[in-house]
Amino acid sequence: KYADYIERAFKIDNTAAFITPGHPEIELALVRLYKATGEKRYIELAKYFIDKRGNCDEPGIYTDWANEYYSQDEIPVRERKTAEGHCVRALYLMCAAADIAYIYKDNDLKTACERFFDSIVNKRMYITGGGGSSNMGESFTIDYDLPNRTAYAETCAAISLAMFAERMLKFGADSRYSDIIERTMYNGIMSGISLDGKSFFYENPLEIDPDFNNINTSTKVKERFPITQRVEVFDCSCCPPNIMRFVASISGLIYGFDDNTVYINQYMNSEGD
C-alpha cells in the first residue's frame, strides 16, 4: 500500500513536495517488490525515478554542500561519466540503475554503470576498496584525491560498492567485479566492526596517529580527523545494521552461474547445490 501511495504522489498526481525521492533507496526496494510480486508497475516506478534524476525542470532545494551533486541530481544517470557527490547515495542509485539496465536490457544505462564503476575503481577508490575521501558531504572529490589520515571511506560506502559490483556480475562473468567484492569485503567492510562484534567504525581511515589526531602535522593547524577507536553507537548508526545485512548475504556472493557454467566468485569454504 505504501508503494502504491508513493506511485500516486510522485508519478500519477504529482503531489510530492519534490521530484526525486532524495536518498536513493526506494529504487532498490521497488526492484525487490517487483521480483516478489510480479507487479510491473513497481519496476516501472523504479525506472521512472532513475529517469527523473537530473532531468527535472523545476530547481531543487539545496544547501551549499547538500547540492545537486550530493543528491545525485546534477545530470541524467545515462550521461554520468564520473562518480560524484555523496558516496553511498551515488552507489545505491547506480545499484538500482544496474538492476534496471539488466531487467530492461538497456544498453545505454549499462554503459553508464560501467563508466561509473571504472571512475571509482581506477581513480577514486582507496586500496582497501573504500570510497569517499571527504567528510564534507561524505563525498567523492576529484581523481586521485585519496589522503590516508583524513580518509572518510564510510563502511556503508564499501558495502554499497560490493552491492554494485554484485549487480554488474549479472551482465556476464567478469573477474573485475568479483575482485572488487573480495577487496571491499576483507578490507573496507570488515574493518568497520570490532572482533567482538560490538563496536564499529563509521569512517575507516588508512592511517591513525593518536598523538596528532585533529592536527595537521605539516601546518600544526587544527583539522577534522576520523575517530581513532570503534564505538558502539553513532548519531547516524547506519553502518552497524548494514554490516549485519552484508554478512548475512555473503553466501550469495560465492557462486555465479549461467545456462552452462558455475563460476566461483569468492574463494572460501562452501558447498553448493
Regions found by a protein language model. Give the residues of each.
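Glycan-recognition and catalytic cores of secretory/periplasmic carbohydrate-active enzymes
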Residues: 1-273
